[in-house]
Amino acid sequence: MKKSIFFLAASAIMFAMGSCTNDVLDNVQQVDSSLPQTRATASNDWTYAYVLSEGTWHVAPPSSPGNIVRYDNNWTKKSTLEIGDTGNDLIQYGSKLYCAVSGHDLTADNGGIWVLNAKTGQLLTPQMKQYDDEKTGHKAMPRHLAAANGKVYISFYSGAVMSIDTMNYAKVNYLELDATYSEGICIGKDNKVYVCNSGNTDDTQAGEGTTISVLPLTLD
C-alpha cells in the first residue's frame, strides 16, 4: 500500500511521500528499538493534510478501494473520499488537487482523474473523469501527474501521455510513446516533459524498460 501526504499551510505547501508493500512488511524480522517508532512534523503551522491511500491491488479477492483522507493540524480526520481501484498519484496545481487512479488493469476501464478543491477538499468533478486511450482502445490507466502552463500531464500505463486543460479537464493533446508501462512524469526547467518507462516497446512485464521519453509541452 502506498500513501502520499500533503500538508497545506497558509503560505507554503510541503509534500512528503512514503510507501510500503506487503512484501516488505511480511519480511520484517525485527525492529531496532533504539529508533523512534513515530514520525512527527517539525511544527503544526499547516492547515490540512491530505493522505492518498493506494488501496490493495488483488487479482482475487477483489481489490480494496483507495481513498483520500483529509486531516486537520491536530490529525483529526475530517473527511474520506473513496476514489476507486489503485489511487496512484496526488498533486496540487494552483487551487486544485488532481488524483490519478490507475484502475485494475489496462482493459478494466475503471481508471481516471479526480479533481478537488485544495482548500476545502470538496470534489470539483462529480464523477471521476475518464479518458480514452487510443493505444489500447480502452479507458486510460493513469499512473503519474505533472503540471505546467495551465495543463496537467498524465502518464498512461499503456505507454502514452495526455495533457488536459485545468479549467474544463478536457483532453488537449495525446501522444503514444515507443514504450510501455510509463510511470513517473515531470516538467523540466527546459520546459520539456520527461517520462520514465518501466517497459520498452516489446517488453511483456513492467520493470524491464530502460528508457526516458523527452517531449515538448505540446506533445507533438
Residue ranges and their predicted role:
Residues S4-I5, A16-A49:
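Bacterial Sec-dependent N-terminal signal peptides
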Residues L35-T41, D85-G94, K135-A146, A179-G188:
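Repeated scaffold domains used in trafficking and secretory/extracellular systems
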Residues D45-T47, G94-S95, N149-G150, D190-N191:
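Short coil/turn segments that connect the beta-strands within blades of beta-propeller domains
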Residues V51, C99-A100, I154, V195:
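Residue position within the beta-strands of beta-propeller blades
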Residues G55-A60, G103-A108, G159-A160, G199-T204:
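Short glycine/acidic-enriched loop and turn motifs that connect beta-strands
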Residues G66-V69, G111-W114, A160-S163, T210-S213:
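A short loop-to-beta-strand structural motif that recurs across blades of beta-propeller domains
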Residues W75-E82, Q122-T136, A170-E176, D220:
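A short beta-strand motif characteristic of beta-propeller blades
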Residues K171-D220:
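Solenoidal tandem-repeat scaffolds enriched in leucines and small polar residues
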